[in-house]
From Swiss-Prot:
InterPro entries: Mediator_Med10 (IPR019145). GO terms for molecular function: transcription coregulator activity. Component of the Mediator complex. It is found in: Nucleus. The keyword Transcription applies. It holds the Pfam family Med10. This is Mediator of RNA polymerase II transcription subunit 10. GO terms for cellular component: mediator complex.
């Protein structure tokens, strides 16, 4: 069962390849689970179980040796979510929510400091008119460029 599909293009070839490797690995784990559950204790079932275990080890090894998997490290939190049986999309959603809250807080701080700069500059300009050009220079240098 896949939750999303990846379009095959020249730019994401390694991603598609890794996705296919992971899908094959998941299938092998499912088949291995079935073999373990249905194990009769016979030589034939032992051979099938050994073969499937070696296949899983081989697939894990090829996935680990892939350069693409080292290029994009997976956060430990995501692995913990998966190990706990939770959906890793929950981690992504929570990460985005925390980042949005942090960005909103920082934006509020920036706006507060801009207002402080403007009010302080106006008050200083009224009290010390001879500093007017320096105050305007500071305001101009500390005002973010609007694009």
């Amino acid at each position: 069962m896949t939750t999303a599909t990846i379009d095959s293009s020249s730019g994401n070839g390694p991603l598609v390849s890794t996705t296919e490797q992971l899908q094959g690995l998941i299938e092998s784990f499912i088949e291995l689970g079935v073999l373990v559950h249905d194990n009769q204790g016979t030589q034939q079932s032992h051979t099938a179980l050994t073969h499937k275990t070696n296949q899983v080890i081989s697939q894990l090894s090829s996935l680990t040796d892939s350069g693409f998997t080292h290029q994009y490290p997976i956060p430990v939190d995501v692995i913990s979510y998966i190990e706990d049986g939770r959906n890793p999309d929950v981690y992504t959603r929570e990460f985005v929510e925390v980042t949005a809250k942090s960005n909103a807080r920082l934006k509020g701080k920036m706006l507060g400091f801009q207002k402080l700069r403007d009010v302080l500059g106006d008050k200083l300009g009224k009290e010390f008119p001879e500093l007017g050009s320096a105050i305007e220079d500071i305001k101009k240098r500390t005002t973010p460029d609007e694009e």
